[in-house]
Structure formats: structure tokens, C-alpha cells
Amino acid sequence: MNYKIYTDGACSGNPGIGGWGVVIVNKNDKKIYLNGGEKFTTNNQMELTAAIKALKYFNTSKKIILHTDSKYLKDGIEQWIKNWKKNGWKTFTKKPVKNKELWVELDNLIKKHFITWIWVKGHDGILYN
């Protein structure tokens, strides 16, 4: 079964109080809503957390189309992470990767799923974003 997942993260102040949200839609249009937050976090941490919580929802391998308005999340998981791992979790400027623990967790979670990552423009009238 294919699932569509919509994730988002936000922060008031950066860092500051933040939250994340997830909508999971199955082929029968049934929706599952997940959300949470942190007292002291960043926008990027909340974006990563939303994706992590969405993928942790599933106990078995799924085909997923994951929509995010975070280029940080999409580019990080599709492009940057390969080099970060090769470089000992350092950026191309030799600085430590920010949010490494979250990236490692996400990287481990994606291994059991078939995921297509879709970037959507934030606050552009897209349902569930």
C-alpha cells in the first residue's frame, strides 16, 4: 500500500519553542495525525523530527511519498548525507554536521521503506502543509 505523508516543523524564535506535525494519508483517504513539540529547539530540528516520527509510525516496510517544505530535510537526506557519512559526519567545510543524531536516526529509518521525497513550497495553499 502506498502512503502519502505530509510533514512540517516550526519554531518561534530560532532556537525557541517549536513544534512538528505529520499527516499520513492511506489509499482509502484515511488520515492519521501526529504532532508534538519541544521547549527549546530549532526549525530544522522540528522538520527532521516530523519526518522521523512519521516513519517511526510504521512497523513494516511501506511505499511512501513524503512531502516537505524543508529543502534542508529533502536535500540533506537525498544529497548531503552521503558525503557527511564519507567525511566522518563533517560538512564539506570540515565542520561537524548540525543535528547529527537526528540525521543518523532518519538515515536508519529510511532503509526499511521505499520513499519518494517531494519538496513543496511552504504556505502556498497545499493541503496538509
Model region roles, listed by residue range:
Residues 10-14, 52-129:
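RNase H catalytic domain
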Residues 1-45, 49, 53-62:
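RNase H-like nuclease fold core
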